[in-house]
């Protein structure tokens, strides 16, 4: 059995892996950027549903869930800051494919991205996501993470978010080993070398990965 350092070294130097060649992943990524069905339009604050300013001029949701935008003052500067006290989860699944370490990456399309899709963790969820406060479905692979034994967790650590944008926000950062599982739409098993190679594309890798 390889040590962790040996697994990392092999994965970092593997560009054409047993699952995908790097060129196949690049082609997939480029096609996502050309997705004409994913369109984003800026709207005025007054056009948002169920959001409003409270008596203290914080921007909040009627349900008091999700997050709020509060005012902070520091160094004679007054800014808006995101207040989201619930702990989020940033999780990455790993597996061995023909002896090479792979991580399950989501090519995630989000409205605020400079590019349409970014390489992101397997799970990137707030409490509102995994408690289905928005009325939608659970994040992909959420139940898989819950079923993984604790001794399969390589990393399980509480870490802070960006303090310039979030007020005392924390995420549970998890890396867990699993048997090979099939990819859902928008997910790819990638070697660490393949992920690193994507840095040649500007704005391609989500900061949470």
Where on the chain are the PLM-derived regions?
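Mixed-charge (acidic/basic) macromolecular-recognition segments
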Residues: 1-26, 101, 111-209
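Sparse, context-dependent recognition of short Cys/His-centered cofactor- or disulfide-binding micro-motifs
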Residues: 54, 77-79, 160
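Aromatic- and glycine-enriched beta-alpha-beta binding-site module
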Residues: 65-131
